[in-house]
Amino acid sequence: MARIVGVEIPNDKKVEIALTYIYGIGRTRAKQICEATNIDPDKRVRELNDEEISKIATYIQQNFKVEGELRTEVMQNIKRLIDIGCYRGFRHKLGLPVRGQKTKSNARTRKGPRPSRIKKKK
């Protein structure tokens, strides 16, 4: 397995797909990276030589925030919303949907499982 930006990417996948294993890189960015580094996106990772792997790694480090750096930025943004006390921060703090969705019947993912009820014996 090749190691790019601290992430082991699978050898048997095409470069375009394998790059999406890195947090912060989706299909569109993976295509951009392949285009910018002149690497065929349909090539398998095991077919890449060390020079091509290092070319991809340096391009990603210079142009994108990925992995830990991106995760910390997202967490800091959420923390900032909570600290300033805005509506979105309040919703984050309560663990409810942030973007205006209804919560009367749905939103189980954000709310978590329903509290269990104890049945009375007759």
Curated annotation (Swiss-Prot):
Belongs to the universal ribosomal protein uS13 family. This is Small ribosomal subunit protein uS13. Keywords: Ribonucleoprotein, Ribosomal protein, RNA-binding, rRNA-binding, tRNA-binding. Transmembrane segments: none annotated. The keyword Aminoacyl-tRNA synthetase does not apply. It holds the Pfam family Ribosomal_S13. GO terms for biological process: translation. Residues 101-122 have a biased composition (Basic residues). One of its GO terms (cellular component) is cytosol. The keyword tRNA-binding applies. Part of the 30S ribosomal subunit. Forms a loose heterodimer with protein S19. Forms two bridges to the 50S subunit in the 70S ribosome. PANTHER family: 30S RIBOSOMAL PROTEIN S13/40S RIBOSOMAL PROTEIN S18 (PTHR10871), SMALL RIBOSOMAL SUBUNIT PROTEIN US13M (PTHR10871:SF1). Residues 98-122 are annotated as: Disordered. SUPFAM superfamilies: S13-like H2TH domain. Located at the top of the head of the 30S subunit, it contacts several helices of the 16S rRNA. In the 70S ribosome it contacts the 23S rRNA (bridge B1a) and protein L5 of the 50S subunit (bridge B1b), connecting the 2 subunits; these bridges are implicated in subunit movement. Contacts the tRNAs in the A and P-sites. It comes from the Bacteria. GO terms for molecular function: rRNA binding; structural constituent of ribosome; tRNA binding.
